[in-house]
């Protein structure tokens, strides 16, 4: 019998205008740490880490931002949703409509956008 492949992790890649600005947001506002960067002064590709989460940030040319494209939406599972909501609310990352809410599909969650319009939803099963 052939050995079956095993999926271990997923590392989503988010498009950003400036990787250095994205690193600043994810590190200083959301509490991630820099995992790697392809260049220390003008990175075009980098990864940030927090707990068991790894997100990659990739520079995209300014012309690409002129197109009306949907940006990615990540759903990140957490256990203590209330504490995370409080942590982020103190960092001024929420938009006017960010609320901690219970959903009809059985989660408690909140969502907001990073400075590059990538959506971030943090949730736990209710």
Predicted regions and their residues:
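N-terminal beta-strand motif that seeds the catalytic metal site of vicinal oxygen chelate
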Residues: 1-23, 72-74, 125-126
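A generic structural signal for short beta-strands and their flanking turns/coil linkers
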Residues: 8-10, 28-30, 44, 53, ...
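Conserved catalytic-core motifs of GNAT/GCN5-like acyltransferases
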Residues: 13, 33-39, 99
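Vicinal oxygen chelate
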Residues: 17-20, 74-119
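Amphipathic alpha-helical segments
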Residues: 20-33
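Conserved short beta-strand elements that form part of the metal-binding/catalytic scaffold
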Residues: 34-69, 119-124
């Amino acid at each position: 019998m052939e050995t079956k492949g095993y999926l271990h992790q997923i590392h989503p890649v988010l498009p950003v205008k400036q990787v250095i600005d994205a690193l600043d947001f994810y590190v200083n506002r959301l509490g991630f740490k820099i995992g790697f960067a392809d260049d220390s002064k003008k990175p075009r590709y980098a990864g940030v880490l927090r707990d068991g989460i790894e997100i990659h940030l990739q520079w995209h040319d300014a012309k690409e931002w002129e197109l009306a494209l949907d940006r990615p939406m990540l759903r990140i599972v957490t256990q203590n949703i209330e504490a995370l909501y409080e942590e982020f609310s103190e960092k001024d990352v929420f938009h006017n409509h960010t609320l901690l809410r219970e959903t009809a599909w059985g989660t408690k969650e909140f969502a907001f956008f990073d400075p590059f319009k990538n959506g971030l939803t943090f949730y736990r099963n209710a």
